[in-house]
Amino acid sequence: MDNEQLQKLTEDISLQDFGKPFRHRAFFNDRLKTTGGRYMLSSHNIELNRKYLIEHGRSELVGIIKHELCHYHLHLEGKGYKHRDKDFRDLLQKVGAPRFCTPLQTKKTQKKTYMYRCAACGQQYIKKRAMNPERYACGKCRGKIKRIF
């Protein structure tokens, strides 16, 4: 699905479920990492995360679009458009939009760890940050520290 198809889908959902036209832009923003989508208050555009379409399919994307359209229409009407507002929660329930989207299943990359060992006594040190072993000595025996990996 490209941005033109997404725009058409958003306009169709807006007319069918809300009975109001969507007059702004809806597009994929590949920089979104943890959120399904966002409604931009200043421009009234809707940005959506393409990863949700890939991982969870079209039905999840439709739910996210409905959620963002709730923000959109309520904001333009001057009603409560925030998650905590009663108007927003009522409209979510009316159109069958989810309050939160399903979490993504993509694995987060593990942070690199550095392992050091004392040459004299064999004491191991695991660090999250690299260090210069020339500047440090073993805390147990004062021996030289060598980097393993």
Curated annotation (Swiss-Prot):
Pfam family, one: SprT-like
Cysteines engaged in disulfide bonds, as pairs: none
Active-site positions on this chain: 68
The keyword Ligase is annotated on this UniProt entry: no
GO cellular component: cytoplasm
Binding site for Zn(2+): 67, 71
Cofactor annotation remark: Binds 1 zinc ion.
Protein name (Swiss-Prot/TrEMBL): Protein SprT-like
Native species: Bacillus velezensis (strain DSM 23117 / BGSC 10A6 / LMG 26770 / FZB42) (Bacillus amyloliquefaciens subsp. plantarum)
